[in-house]
A protein has these predicted regions:
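Amphipathic/hydrophobic helical signal segments and adjacent flexible N-terminal regions
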Residues: 2-50, 146-153
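Hydrophobic alpha-helical segments
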Residues: 16, 54-57
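Secondary-structure transition motifs
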Residues: 127-151
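Short edge beta-strand segments in beta-sheet-rich domains
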Residues: 56-58, 107-109, 139-144
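Contiguous, well-ordered beta-strand patches that form the walls/edges
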Residues: 29-30, 36, 41-53, 64-136
Length: 153
């Protein structure tokens, strides 16, 4: 009898873990779908200093459904890479890895928020800890970017 009860408990535990993993995957899939498309940078802050709004607006990012991103400056690709999301964390986390250039293969840890029209991203340079808030300060070297979705034509 005890063995049957133990088996039932283990079975219920596995079901609960599977359901939790499915919920995590569903939230991440939803965010991945929201992320897909073109996003215009509307503001950027680096290491505690706000970038010139006109310079920030020269930048945009195109995100594919497959996790590939392309950073563009005045329409020209300047970098591309991959991202992996985890919407189950609070704040939600993103790992960014460039696919080319002198930073190829380096891991940038970040956090994000996203909705239909806007998204916020705060990330740290390689080998630094993941940001814990959507802000920068002198000395932390974080990059905080706010985007607006570009409507398809």
């Amino acid at each position: 009898m005890k063995q049957l009860a133990l088996c039932c408990l283990l079975g219920l535990g596995l079901v609960a873990m599977t359901l939790a993993e499915d919920a995590k995957n569903d939230a991440t899939r939803k965010d991945r779908m929201l992320l897909e498309g073109t996003w215009q940078v509307v503001s950027m802050e680096v290491n505690g200093e706000k970038s010139d709004p006109a310079d920030a607006r020269k930048l945009s990012v195109i995100n594919g459904a497959d996790g590939i991103w392309s950073l563009r400056s005045e329409g020209q690709e300047v970098a591309r890479g991959t991202n992996s999301l985890d919407a189950s964390k609070s704040p939600k986390t993103v790992d960014l890895v460039p696919l080319d250039g002198d930073k190829k293969g380096e891991l940038y840890l970040g956090i994000y928020e996203i909705n239909e029209k806007t998204r916020r991203l705060c990330f740290a340079p390689p080998l630094m800890a993941r940001p814990t808030e959507f802000a920068t300060q002198t000395g932390n070297q974080w990059i905080f970017v706010t985007f607006e979705r570009v409507k398809p034509k």
